[in-house]
């Protein structure tokens, strides 16, 4: 009986060793096993349903440029945190730009550091698009372009954010006659001091459907003759398309070599202000009647709009900016360095200006309009 039991044990042990050997052989020579859980891997069909690995906080997402940046981030499968101070109905247009659960809306206070810390603490990318065309009793240009960006940059650095992108202006200069541009220049410096690896974007005047550039000039037809300082013969502009700026920002997020650099985003052509406004009115099929208005008189007119209780159509500072020639910064990288071909104004102007046409010309083609004359100065 004992011998039989012993033989049975031996047979069991021998079978166990062979089974182990077979299992080991199948493991070594079989298909490789997945080592990561599927939830950790990028998945989906691509586009908004994919996972890019980017978690971006976009300050100023409710503005003109912000909607394009959020859309480009959302269409590549990024999670976007959108701080807002406005009414909830003013952010409804952003909700379809990302997949379910990919857009997170958080109320914030621009002067509360705890509020800022809360919206950046889980992000690996922070983009600052905060801007204002005119000062208010609550926020002047120093608040908007210096103090708030400085606080965001400092708290982003403390939170361990990998990428910080700050949008300034091509003509930012501490010696500028425009208070707007002087504060933009100071803002660049304080952001660079707080976050040395920050990426600073310096776009020229941006045009697009919701802009305050082409639309602002086109709306002058309501006042009859068009006032221009020195008739616009002394000012050169190089506007850039909003989609190009948005793509450039997103490409800078993905570019590992962009950290710590400043980029100048400009359009492919430079125009005298006179020729540019003339082209705007030609596309809108409006009568162009320019007349020279001295800048001091232009400022008086702007002051009247500033004291009105409504959104000012023009301000004294905007008069200054409108008549400042766009700088050439060949030492800075641009859109081409981020893989983007700048879009000519003539290809997209109709998208902006069609709504300024009368019913008679609403469906007219753009081919009957001569392109604006370009300059090389």
From Swiss-Prot:
Q: Which residues carry this modification: N6-succinyllysine?
A: 175
What the record says about family reads:
Belongs to the complex I NDUFA9 subunit family.
**Subunit structure of this chain's protein:** Complex I is composed of 45 different subunits. This a component of the hydrophobic protein fraction. Interacts with BLOC1S1. Interacts with SLC2A4. Interacts with CLOCK. Interacts with RAB5IF.
The compartments listed are: Mitochondrion matrix
Specify the protein name.
NADH dehydrogenase [ubiquinone] 1 alpha subcomplex subunit 9, mitochondrial
Q: Would you say which domain of life the source belongs to?
A: Eukaryota
Report what the Swiss-Prot or TrEMBL entry states about this protein's PTMs: Acetylated on lysine residues. BLOC1S1 is required for acetylation. Acetylated by CLOCK in a circadian manner.
Task: Return the transit peptide range from the UniProt record.
Answer: 1-35
Q: So what does this one do?
A: Accessory subunit of the mitochondrial membrane respiratory chain NADH dehydrogenase (Complex I), that is believed not to be involved in catalysis. Complex I functions in the transfer of electrons from NADH to the respiratory chain. The immediate electron acceptor for the enzyme is believed to be ubiquinone.
Q: Which cofactor does it need?
A: FAD
* Any Gene Ontology CC annotation: respiratory chain complex I
Listed GO biological process terms: circadian rhythm; ubiquinone biosynthetic process
Q: Which SUPFAM superfamilies match?
A: NAD(P)-binding Rossmann-fold domains
- For this protein, what is any one GO molecular function term? protein-containing complex binding
Cofactor binding mode, per the note? Binds 1 FAD per subunit.
Q: Name one Pfam family in it.
A: Epimerase
Sequence positions bearing N6-acetyllysine: 189, 370
Origin organism is Pan troglodytes (Chimpanzee)
Q: Which UniProt keywords apply?
A: Acetylation, Electron transport, FAD, Flavoprotein, Mitochondrion, Respiratory chain, Transit peptide, Transport
* Record keyword Electron transport present: yes
């Amino acid at each position: 009986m004992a011998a039989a039991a012993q033989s049975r044990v031996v047979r069991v042990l021998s079978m166990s060793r062979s089974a182990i050997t077979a299992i080991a052989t199948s493991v070594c020579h079989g298909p490789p096993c997945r080592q990561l859980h599927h939830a950790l891997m990028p998945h989906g069909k691509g586009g908004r349903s994919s996972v890019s690995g980017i978690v971006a906080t976009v300050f100023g997402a409710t503005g003109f440029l912000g909607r394009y940046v959020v859309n480009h981030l959302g269409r590549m499968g990024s999670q976007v945190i959108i701080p807002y101070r406005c009414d909830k109905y003013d952010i409804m247009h952003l909700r379809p730009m990302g997949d379910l659960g990919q857009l997170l809306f958080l109320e914030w206070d621009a002067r509360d550091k705890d509020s800022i810390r809360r919206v950046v603490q889980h992000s690996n990318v922070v983009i600052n698009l905060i801007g204002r065309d005119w000062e208010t009793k609550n926020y002047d240009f120093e608040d908007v372009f210096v103090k708030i960006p400085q606080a965001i940059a400092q708290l982003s650095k403390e939170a361990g954010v990998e990428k910080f992108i700050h949008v300034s202006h091509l003509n930012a200069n501490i010696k500028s006659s425009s208070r707007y541009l002087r504060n933009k220049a100071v803002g660049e410096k304080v952001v660079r001091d707080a976050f040395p690896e920050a990426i600073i974007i310096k776009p020229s005047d941006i045009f697009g459907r919701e802009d305050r550039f082409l639309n602002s000039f086109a709306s002058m037809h309501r006042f009859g003759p068009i006032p221009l300082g020195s008739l616009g013969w002394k000012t050169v502009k190089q506007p850039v398309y909003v989609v190009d700026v948005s793509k450039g920002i997103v490409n800078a997020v993905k570019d590992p070599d962009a950290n710590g650099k400043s980029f100048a985003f400009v359009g492919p052509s430079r125009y005298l202000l006179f020729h540019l406004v003339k082209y705007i009115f030609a596309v809108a099929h409006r009568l162009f009647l320019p007349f020279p208005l001295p800048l001091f008189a232009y400022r008086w007119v702007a002051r009247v709009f500033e004291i009105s209780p409504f959104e000012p159509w023009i301000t004294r500072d905007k008069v200054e900016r409108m008549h400042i020639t766009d700088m050439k910064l060949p030492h800075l990288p641009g859109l081409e360095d981020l893989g983007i071909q700048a879009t000519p104004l003539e290809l997209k102007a109709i998208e902006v200006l069609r709504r300024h046409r009368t019913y008679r010309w609403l469906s007219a083609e753009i081919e009957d309009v001569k392109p604006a004359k370009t300059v090389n100065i």
